[in-house]
Amino acid sequence: MKELIQSLLEQTLESLKAQGIVPADFEARIQVDRTKDKSHGDLATNLAMMLTKVAGKPPREMAQLIIDNLPASAQVAKVEIAGPGFINFFIDDNALANQLKAALGDAMLGVKAAAPQTVVVDYSSPNLAKEMHVGHLRSTIIGDSVVRALEFLGHKVIRQNHVGDWGTQFGMLLAYMEELRAQGDDKANLELSDLESFYRAAKLRFDESDEFATRARQLVVELQSGDAYCNKLWREFNDISLSHCHDVYARLGVSLTRKDVHGESAYNADLAQVVADLDAKGLLAISDGAKVVFQEEFRNKDGEPLPVIIQKADGGFLYATTDLAAMRYRSGVLNADRVLYFVDLRQALHFQQVFSLARTAGFVRDNMTLEHMGFGTMNGEDGRPFKTRSGGVVKLVDLLDEAVERAEQLVRSKNPDMDETEVKEIARVVGIASVKYADLSKNRSSDYIFSFEQMLSFEGNTAPYLLYAYTRVAGIFKKAENIDLTNAELVLDHDKEKELGNKLAQFGEILARMVDKGQPHILCGYLYELAGAFSSFYEACPVLSADSETARDSRLLLSRLTADTLKQGLSLLGIETLERM
């Protein structure tokens, strides 16, 4: 309905231009919003106030002119002027009911496909030298939910797992791997099964043994020069590390696969050319032996230009160089319209600098957007970054294990007679869903406090609450499996039916906002409100015991669309649903 009102207003604006009331060259971004108070209609616009100055008319007079020129639509029951010049639209109940009925027979649930774009999404991107930890959670699940929603809306999405698979630390790891292999493959494989311990042991050898450190540095040089033996060792290590990552992805229900891996090493051959091209454009300067770029718009607190370091004095390249090569690849080869980077907010300045430099250097097309979708920190209940009791980094797999264990205790306490297999399956779904939803339901730009107690609660905006809400709606159909709804009509007579219907009709708008802003909490908030609207409807409007078959069948249709929307919405967040809890 929002798109309909927008279209009617666009036609009206053209009519006002044709009549000379509004200048022909005037461009307006017409905004239509949902009203909070339904006594003021369903949708509202401030277009009259936008046109007041250019048309030279008072806002309310301008609003009346808009209404007088508005094309007639059977889907609009009435239009009113409110306050200083807002225009309120009341949607016809039958039109809304017909829209909802059509959504029931549609795989997209009535959501219109967007004008398709090619969207590259850079997310997760762990460092392969170490095991995935809680710091990787936000990028991985926020990026994945936005990817799912983009694909649902019809966009071509290219996932890019920009893993850290290159650098001097790999010399140390390969030297240790080589040392263990000399003692037998079994020992090497055993130690590699715990990457965190492997990394610590390698670092200890590097710090304590000059001979080992020399060998590690030698391996870095050989690896970078393309030595076949080193390359083989490096590939073996990365393969093992990626297996660890994909085990975690599988548990999280994340859609990344091996073919989405396009790590730092993929750009090695392009880095020298990036430097040469920046030099050819006169952008490079030398600072303390390093090749850097100074950009006037980026200065420190003393007003001095901040450099982007492109190549160190020893010839080594940096993240900025690799990111520039990646941007050029994503523009020229992948032909992206949008590139979204789900990376920690603390990297904001880095991305501002490299985005600006990529444009100045002509590495990306003018019509391609570069968007840093930064996120805050996941903190413990002490308000500090989440750590183990001893102050160490929490492995992501350990966090998931604890969530599932706690969920299992919860399920057992509520269902002491439940079958063991079912308990474990429900616990798995609830545990993983709770971790994901606790994160996704927060504004990604904010830090948040991680609390097992809060995330496993059945009250408030949590995964258990929504999963239970879905099972409650789906449960109605177990009792109504013999009722034929083929010819049922959907009618909205009760206020609570209309409220639920209006909420269901917003699904497409919500998804469009979510992918535009890269903010999954928008969808989470909507699903929570939808579950609340259904609860209010269910209390006020008996379904199976309705006064008539017509009312019963209509309410069953509303319930079916609610269940489908909850399930689809949770699926777009990467969350499985349950038929019973």
Curated annotation (Swiss-Prot):
Subunit record text: Monomer.
PROSITE patterns registered for this protein in UniProt: AA_TRNA_LIGASE_I
Enzyme class: ligase
Organism field: Shewanella amazonensis (strain ATCC BAA-1098 / SB2B)
HAMAP family to which the protein is assigned, alphabetical: Arg_tRNA_synth
UniProt cross-references to PANTHER family, sorted A to Z: ARGININE--TRNA LIGASE, CYTOPLASMIC (PTHR11956:SF5), ARGINYL-TRNA SYNTHETASE (PTHR11956)
Motif ('HIGH' region): 126-136
Subcellular location: Cytoplasm
UniProt record, GO biological process: arginyl-tRNA aminoacylation
Coarse class of the protein's main subcellular location: cytoplasm
Family: Belongs to the class-I aminoacyl-tRNA synthetase family.
Gene Ontology CC: cytoplasm
GO molecular function: arginine-tRNA ligase activity; ATP binding
Disulfide bonds: none
Protein name (database record): Arginine--tRNA ligase
Listed EC numbers: 6.1.1.19
Catalytic activity: tRNA(Arg) + L-arginine + ATP = L-arginyl-tRNA(Arg) + AMP + diphosphate
InterPro entries, alphabetized: aa-tRNA-synth_I_CS (IPR001412), Arg-tRNA-ligase (IPR001278), Arg-tRNA-synth_N (IPR005148), Arg-tRNA-synth_N_sf (IPR036695), ArgRS_core (IPR035684), DALR_anticod-bd (IPR008909), Rossmann-like_a/b/a_fold (IPR014729), tRNAsynth_Ia_anticodon-bd (IPR009080)
Keywords, sorted A to Z: Aminoacyl-tRNA synthetase, ATP-binding, Cytoplasm, Ligase, Nucleotide-binding, Protein biosynthesis
